[in-house]
């Protein structure tokens, strides 16, 4: 629960007020013409939404501005678009993806999956065909929802080929 100032947190893994705030910012960026949003999942502090590292956000914002002004097609922030379930696995496709997805480590801790009971379990995630995720956990026979990096602060493992982090997401079938 977000009791403290919105930009501060206790570093609790299950605390997701920043994730909700990022989601609302993304929705606004899709509704307002000539705006965009970058993901800062690759930098930040566990207890403060404003990263001390200003260079990384500046570089991401520069790429976004270039794409908006010069109508370039590079991927700045890939966002989860569609989710479908097949044979006990969830598949996620992405919007704004003009290059391949890359898992920077084999660690898939930022991924969680649930069934209809809404109990989330750590999940295995694999990039397939360079543009889709396959997410599963053998304990979840009929998956219906997935989270990626859905917390205030934590490790980001999913990037585009050019090194831009994929936006955290929470999707249901």
Residue ranges and their predicted role:
Residues 56, 63-106:
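Surface beta-strand/loop "capping" patches
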Residues 7-41, 54:
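Substrate-gating cap/lid alpha-helix
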Residues 98-173:
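C-terminal beta-sandwich/jelly-roll accessory domains of carbohydrate-active enzymes
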Residues 25, 61, 146:
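Hydrophobic, well-ordered secondary-structure elements that form the walls
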Residues 1-3:
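Short, small-residue-biased leader/transition segments that mark boundaries at the very start
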Residues 31-34, 43, 63, 67-71, ...:
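Short, well-ordered loop/turn and helix-capping segments at boundaries between secondary-structure elements
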Residues 41-50:
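Short beta-alpha connecting loops at secondary-structure transitions
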Residues 50-59:
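Short, surface-exposed amphipathic charged segments that create phosphate/polyanion-binding patches used
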